[in-house]
Amino acid sequence: MSYFGTDGIRGKFGELPITPDFILKLGYVTGLVLIENSQNSARKPSVVIGKDTRLSGYVIEGALQAGFNAAGVDVHMLGPLPTPAIAHLTRSFNADAGVVISASHNPYYDNGIKFFSGDGKKLTDEMQNAINDKLDTIMAATGSNDALMPILDPAQLGKNNRIDDAKGRYIEFCKGSFPYQYDLDHLTVVVDCANGAGYSVAPRVMRELGANVIAINHKPDGININAHCGSTHPEGLQAAVLKYEADVGIALDGDGDRIVMVDEAGHLVDGDGILYVLATQGQTKVAGVVGTLMSNMGLELALKAADIEFTRAKVGDRYVMQELEANGWILGGEPSGHILCLDKSRTGDAIIASLQILAVMQARGKALSDLTEGFEVLPQKLVNVRLSQMQDPFEHEELVAAFDKARATLEGRGRLLIRQSGTEPMIRVMVESDDEIECDVMANDLADKIKDTLG
């Protein structure tokens, strides 16, 4: 079976695959794959491990560490840090891989594992397949662990060390992405940390660049991560921006790789709006922008008006990255807030993306609401249909017929997207149209039909 979804391995803690026993085996087989692929047989491979603020992260961290050590791999422990920090520090420490323990924007009871290669990019499909194949073998042989996980001579085991200055290293990296000729003096910024991995570093970066920072949802307790806060629940940020009369608001998700923003009037600026500002008014001229199938048609039309090419990748930041590299471009992202600025960082980074927007505001002396003028969002309705188990809607003729009929109705003035979640039993129904009422009715009707058919 395949253990990897669209963004690593994820599930509810205590249920396969997110159990201590499975995670131990995952660390072990990943260590074996790293050893097999090592270009330097004279040294032990090494990995860095970071996590978000979920309580279950401590258990998973220990199991992963033990698995890697048993395979003969050294481990550098980073503690709670945003996902892009782990990607950066993987390169900084010349490690063979980076490991993130997080379920991103999911609730606290979920957790997951995602990997970076030594260059700070998501693992290749080939590497994931190699890990998956070894997992299949070891999971199929219940009770044979002694044979499948041979004990190494103690001299060959991996060792661990904790990196005490990991936060400081990442903070300096983020600050280095901000143009030296500007600062954030006289700017009031509300930062919603989602009680997640960015709770400490995000406010510090802004403060050290001179901003008056009002941090909210920055006191994690292990179970309040993403709880009615962060990029998936921006209502609190919008209220805080208005309450404190702030210049701008920034919301991260639980692992710090997604961002949405709020302008001074309390209006939400999602990933599409951020891409528009950076593409049309940013510090670096761009030839083209990569969005996804979920990107609003309004972004495509606004970029076309500015003579900037636009193309769509499959949903997922790894596919945005692939399309950027194929085109030789540097800017891409998703409406959900994964923003890739490849001239600043090799992975999606909420803090770095926000700094680029703040730099544009300072350079042009404009409010965020002024910068987003010219970008008109087409009415869009997204409905998530939660199912009892993973099912494919395209295997049911009556659903396919309903989808085809809706697409014919929207032809030339809108879009329909039906997408299965890669991490949970959910179907996403997205309708765009020049008619807001039609959007709402069509999306809900199709969602009801999916729910009635698939349960």
Swiss-Prot record:
Per the record, residues carrying Phosphoserine are 104
Which cofactor is essential here?
Mg(2+)
Q: What is its EC number?
A: 5.4.2.10
Q: What is the recorded post-translational modification?
A: Activated by phosphorylation.
Q: Which residues bind Mg(2+)?
A: 104, 253, 255, 257
Q: Does the keyword Magnesium apply?
A: yes
Keywords noted in UniProt? Isomerase, Magnesium, Metal-binding, Phosphoprotein
Q: Name one GO molecular function term.
A: phosphomannomutase activity
- Which Gene Ontology terms describe the biological processes this protein takes part in? carbohydrate metabolic process; peptidoglycan biosynthetic process; UDP-N-acetylglucosamine biosynthetic process
Stored SUPFAM superfamilies: Phosphoglucomutase, C-terminal domain, Phosphoglucomutase, first 3 domains
Q: Which GO terms describe its cellular component?
A: cytosol
Q: Which Pfam families match?
A: PGM_PMM_I, PGM_PMM_II, PGM_PMM_III, PGM_PMM_IV
Query: Which reaction equations make up its catalytic activity?
Result: alpha-D-glucosamine 1-phosphate = D-glucosamine 6-phosphate
UniProt KW Phosphoprotein keyword = yes
Q: Where is the active site?
A: 104
The record ties this protein, via InterPro entries, to: A-D-PHexomutase_a/b/a-I, A-D-PHexomutase_a/b/a-I/II/III, A-D-PHexomutase_a/b/a-II, A-D-PHexomutase_a/b/a-III, A-D-PHexomutase_C, A-D-PHexomutase_C_sf, A-D-PHexomutase_CS, Alpha-D-phosphohexomutase_SF
For this protein, what does the record note about how its cofactor is bound? Binds 1 Mg(2+) ion per subunit.
Q: Which domain of life is it from?
A: Bacteria
Recorded family membership: Belongs to the phosphohexose mutase family.
The record's section on HAMAP family has:
GlmM_B
Protein purpose: Catalyzes the conversion of glucosamine-6-phosphate to glucosamine-1-phosphate.
Q: What is this protein called?
A: Phosphoglucosamine mutase
